[in-house]
From Swiss-Prot:
This is Uracil-DNA glycosylase. It comes from Geobacillus kaustophilus (strain HTA426). The gene is ung. Keywords: Cytoplasm, DNA damage, DNA repair, Hydrolase. The keyword DNA damage applies. InterPro entries: UDG_fam1 (IPR002043), Ura-DNA_Glyclase_AS (IPR018085), Uracil-DNA_glycosylase-like (IPR005122), Uracil-DNA_glycosylase-like_sf (IPR036895). It catalyses: Hydrolyzes single-stranded DNA or mismatched double-stranded DNA and polynucleotides, releasing free uracil. GO terms for molecular function: uracil DNA N-glycosylase activity. The active site is at D64 (proton acceptor). It is found in: Cytoplasm. Belongs to the uracil-DNA glycosylase (UDG) superfamily. UNG family.
């Protein structure tokens, strides 16, 4: 059964056959069998499932998935409904409020962004419970580098949001002058005050998309408390 069912599939078909990926797959089989790994194995590629290649307008790079129970579901920075909003995402929502006036929602479920063309991509797609960066250096970086290179090849202008050193290391792969790179410190409480707050990435992204004839992103994540009744 194919891993991907949309237009990413033919683009990444070769990648899934490369020796590094086959080795990564064997490593993951053993990890999922013997440990608690996040996200659920069916959610690993959700960034690509929710945002087909043709639809990508924005790339928001994260590091590795959240490593607490029930948080990660395959989209960078996003958490499932009913899970408390983590500190970095709370700071993203604060900046969004200050930038565009969006109200701060009661959840951190970012599928609405993904469905509009925001590729919510972590550079490493799996993690052991409670152990940040535990799957770093196992092969995911090669895979996500390829995803970034493919987006870089697009003719349509794309905005790359690179927050923090880890994401900014990928800048060398973004060589197409059509695209816009917006860099800032990571939204983590440890660094947000050093220039993440006030850098207005959401309005800048929408201004760039509009200027190039692309539909802007509706960044407002709605409350789900009322809808859950």
């Amino acid at each position: 059964m194919p891993i991907l069912k949309n237009d990413w599939a033919p683009l990444l078909e070769e990648e899934f056959q490369k020796p590094y990926y086959l080795k990564l797959r064997e490593f993951l089989k053993e990890e999922y069998r013997t440990r608690t790994i996040y996200p659920d194995m069916h959610d690993i590629f959700n960034a690509l499932h929710y945002t087909p290649y043709a639809n990508v307008k924005v790339v928001l790079l994260g590091q590795d998935p959240y490593h607490g129970p029930g948080q990660a579901h395959g989209l960078s920075f996003s958490v499932k409904p009913g899970v408390p909003v983590p500190p970095s995402l709370a700071n993203i929502f604060k900046e969004l409020h200050d930038d565009l006036g969006c109200y701060i929602p009661d959840n951190g479920y970012l599928v609405k962004w993904a469905e509009q063309g925001v590729l919510l991509l972590n550079t490493v797609l799996t993690v052991r419970r409670g152990q940040a960066n535990s799957h770093r250096g196992k092969g995911w970086e090669y895979f996500t580098d390829r995803v970034i290179e493919l987006v870089n090849e697009k003719d349509d202008p794309v905005v790359f949001l690179l927050w923090g050193r880890n994401a900014q290391e990928k800048k060398e792969r973004i060589t197409n002058p059509r695209h816009l790179i917006i860099e800032a410190p990571h939204p983590s409480p440890f660094s947000a005050a050093r220039g993440f707050f006030g850098h207005r990435p959401f309005s800048r992204t929408n201004a760039f998309l509009t200027k190039h004839g692309r539909e802007p992103i509706d960044w407002q994540i709605e409350n789900i408390g009322a809808r859950a009744e």
